[in-house]
Amino acid sequence: MPKSKELVSSSSSGSDSDSEVEKKLKRKKQVVPEKPVKKQKPGESSRALASSKQSSSSRDDNMFQIGKMRYVSVRDFKGKILIDIREYWMDSEGEMKPGRKGISLNMEQWSQLKEQISDIDDAVRKL
């Protein structure tokens, strides 16, 4: 028989057990597992900071804005060149983060898209 989280109010004798069940449900909802904090060694923090600055500047060089918060970027991922067309959003610290909406094209797909641009333009003009 499936367990239900609904509380059925009955006579006053059952109200004590109902309140106990309610308290247990509230406790379960409040418990949120915390993510473990990663500790960095003193030498690592400076290296990580330097690499993040370097990657962000190179990322900015390869980003081309095509809309309000939409960019085309060229990047290297596991030795393969990818062209990303993606929406970005601003986090609470004012840093741009990539959004869910987007696509990554490998070089073959990018070449096929470039070859079909004139056909796509013609289709847009017809509409």
Curated annotation (Swiss-Prot):
This is Activated RNA polymerase II transcriptional coactivator p15. Homodimer. Interacts with CSTF2. It is found in: Nucleus. It comes from Rattus norvegicus (Rat). General coactivator that functions cooperatively with TAFs and mediates functional interactions between upstream activators and the general transcriptional machinery. May be involved in stabilizing the multiprotein transcription complex. Binds single-stranded DNA. Also binds, in vitro, non-specifically to double-stranded DNA (ds DNA). Activity is controlled by protein kinases that target the regulatory region. Phosphorylation inactivates both ds DNA-binding and cofactor function, but does not affect binding to ssDNA. Residues 1-50 are annotated as: Regulatory. The keyword DNA-binding applies. One of its GO terms (molecular function) is single-stranded DNA binding. Transmembrane segments: none annotated. Residues 31-44 have a biased composition (Basic and acidic residues). There is a cross-link at residue 68 (Glycyl lysine isopeptide (Lys-Gly) (interchain with G-Cter in SUMO2)).
